[in-house]
Amino acid sequence: MLRILAPTDFSTDGYNATLVAMQLAKALRAEVVFVHAMAKPPVPAASPESIFRSVYSEEMRKTQVRLLDEAQHLLDILDLRHAEVRYKTLVVPTPFADAMLQVIASENIDLVVIGSRGSSQLKQILIGSNTLELMRLSPVPLLVIPSYDVFDGFENITILLEQMKLPERAGIEMLDSIAQTYNAMLHFLILTKDGQQVQDVSELQEQHSSWQQVLKRPHTTNLLADSEAPTGMRAHIAATNSSLVVLMPEKLSIWEALFSKNLSEELAARAHMPLLILPHKV
């Protein structure tokens, strides 16, 4: 059974991402693991150890109850029974990124569904610091859900290739499962240089075998000159009516990769577009 990690900080943005995680879990027949990374309780440093432990235990109890209540609320508003979507809740008393990496390993997570901004209410912040850190460190694919996104499945998916190759990535099987579940049309968008041409993405000489099943699905191949990336990507997404963009960063720093090739303007313009990040295999 597939397992989906759904971090939450109890913000509106985090709640929206957990809602999508539950909907995906039903469609993919997956289990959801709801996780909250709990900060240390606000106890003065000079307080006795017994007081700290007492406050800590109470905060842990309250957080666990709140997390369970949120999970049950999601079932209620989606009109689901617990038997339809299995889930568990975890409260991990460590910093966010460390907590998520621990759970990814211990719970054999296949996909992380996370909000783009979390508790940050600054409108100019498109992707919050916790999300960015996990995008950089996660060994499994991340589905980044923007604020106030209304999830309605993925009928058209754009897969952005920054080079003339289909690289090996963690999560290609997850992409294939999503495409199969939603009967999606895949639209490969290849950034090209120096007039490079290809009729179909399957013709690329550099492609990993894990893409074979994906390429059997209905797909289109589109070329975009590197110099025209911002406006061309906007036109492509509009023309294909894409509801998901798949990114496979080449650089070590995913932030640098996302905002290379003049794509920062485009990603900012499409901030409401869910992003599926396929990381390098570790």
Question: Which role does the model predict for each range below?
Answer:
Residues M1-S54, D79, N156-N222, A239-L244, ...:
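Small/aliphatic-rich secondary-structure junction motif
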